[in-house]
Amino acid sequence: MLRDWIKENTKSDGTTIIVNENISILPPRTFDGITGLQEVVLPKKLKKIGILSFAWCKGLREIIIPDGVVLIDDEAFRGCVNLEKVNIPSEVVGIGKMAFAFTAIREIVIPDSISIRYIDKGAFYGCSMLDKKCLNIPDGCDFIKD
């Protein structure tokens, strides 16, 4: 099944994955636990990053989430202990429970024009490197769950 999700030019050593352009939803656990994964190229048509899609991908250092993504689901990047940098596109309406928990995120870019409605419980739990001054929650966010 994984072959359906990745392009032929993906590195055979598993360090880089290029997701097929026709994919709009990453289902739960798509790349969960691929510890050697260092780089992911997500398609422009992507709308949703599913539950645990990249959980425990310990080699992942940066993720560029394409414009058009509306949901980063529960625990999507949980345990990506080397993930330091992430951008949140302006179309995102929700960040799920523990979505970025236990990562090494130092700074998170959330645009002022974001249409976000919620950041769920513990979305950034255990992110000890994240300086709260670098987490700017825009006015458009209706609520942050405890």
Task: State what each model feature region is.
Residues 1-14:
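The feature captures the LRR N-terminal capping module
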